[in-house]
Amino acid sequence: MMRGIYIVANDRVMENAIALLNSIRCYNKTVPIFLIPFNEDYHQVAETLGRLHDVKVFPDLDFLEQLTQQIGEIFDRDFLKLPNKMRKLAVWFGPLDEFLYIDTDIVVFEDIVANLDYLSEVGFFCCDYHFSGQKLRNIFSPFVVEQNIFTEKELEDVFN
């Protein structure tokens, strides 16, 4: 079973990507890490992260392009202005069996890969920062409350 990390980046966010990779490698020198290119402007960040931190480019760029094109056709531009933002969904079709997806505006302060051990208890987990003062606005549509998809008690756990 192959475990590892996916990131999405391009040359524009290279400094953030370097900071993220520096923090990951501080605690774990060997975990496989794959870069999913945000767009065609990724060669410099790929070369730099490959040289400094042994990051590999996502192995199926044709699939990535097809996925992006399909997402762009499915979702109206009023809903999703940049289909490339959904390239992160390619993680489900990549070479890793168990994985973390980490945004490049993050730094870690522990061996983040140890969190993959939770997959022995659950099939999926998500950790994301959302300002609690915004309540559900940035996470769920009010529809989930109105239709009782989640109870108020269940939603309280979102801001643990």
Indicate residue ranges for each PLM-predicted region.
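N-proximal low-complexity "stem/linker" segments adjacent to membrane-targeting elements
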Residues: 1-21
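Short, acidic, metal-binding catalytic loop of nucleotide-sugar glycosyltransferases
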Residues: 23-31
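Short internal beta-strands
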Residues: 33-40, 126-128
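Active-site-proximal specificity loops/subdomain of glycosyltransferases
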Residues: 50-94
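Short aromatic/hydrophobic "clamp" motif used to bind/position activated sugar donors
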Residues: 99
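The conserved acidic donor/metal-binding loop of glycosyltransferases
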Residues: 103-107
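Conserved donor-nucleotide/metal-binding helix-loop-beta segment in metal-dependent transferases, i.e.
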Residues: 108-144
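A conserved mid-domain beta-alpha-beta active-site/ligand-binding segment of alpha/beta enzyme cores
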Residues: 149-160
